[in-house]
Amino acid sequence: MKYTLSVLVEDEAGVLTRIAGLFARRGFNIESLAVGPAEQKGISRITMVVPGDDRTVEQLTKQLYKLVNILKVDNITEIPCVERELILVKINASTSSRPEILSILQVFRAKVVDLSENLLVLELTGDPGKVAAIQQLLQKFGIIEIARTGKIALTRTSKVNTEFLKSISMEI
């Protein structure tokens, strides 16, 4: 199973190195990692996706708290969240394939951010499922390059059913 951890850290040099070192020493893998400033000055939020089981994540959380500059570690895997990723895709786009590509982009609300005679660079922001879906649909055109951010997530404060919201956004 994949787990999403939200970690608040002091914005100090070496924090990410210590976290990566902990993962390496313990033999844990980081599948996805995103780091950026949090709501408070001097604090950063690290969102990471790690494979494992409940026991592994519990052990990892305890180990993270032992590191200097770690303020808070939350396993938000089972908590309703707003999750987003960004993907940039450079694909082959001949004149004949462009209409089909553009119709796919319209369905996903993706944008063309660069183009040349035979290539397009596309941008999409969405939940990880949406990002994976467009990536799969674009395979047949010939993907040249992909740059994909790690997942970022914030827990929902409302009691709104996340699955219900996903179903509504897919209908629109």
From Swiss-Prot:
This is Acetolactate synthase small subunit. Transmembrane segments: none annotated. Keywords: Amino-acid biosynthesis, Branched-chain amino acid biosynthesis, Chloroplast, Plastid, Transferase. Pathway: Amino-acid biosynthesis; L-isoleucine biosynthesis; L-isoleucine from 2-oxobutanoate: step 1/4; Amino-acid biosynthesis; L-valine biosynthesis; L-valine from pyruvate: step 1/4. Residues 4-78 form the ACT domain. One of its GO terms (molecular function) is acetolactate synthase regulator activity. Belongs to the acetolactate synthase small subunit family. GO terms for biological process: isoleucine biosynthetic process; L-valine biosynthetic process. Dimer of large and small chains. Its EC number is 2.2.1.6. InterPro entries: Acetalactate_synth_ssu, Acetolactate_synth/TF_NikR_C, Acetolactate_synth_ssu_C, ACT-like_dom_sf, ACT_dom, AHAS_ACT, AHAS_small-like_ACT. It comes from Cyanidium caldarium (Red alga). It is an enzyme of class 2 (transferase). The keyword Chloroplast applies. The keyword Endoplasmic reticulum does not apply. It catalyses: 2 pyruvate + H(+) = (2S)-2-acetolactate + CO2. GO terms for cellular component: chloroplast; cytosol. It is found in: Plastid, Chloroplast.
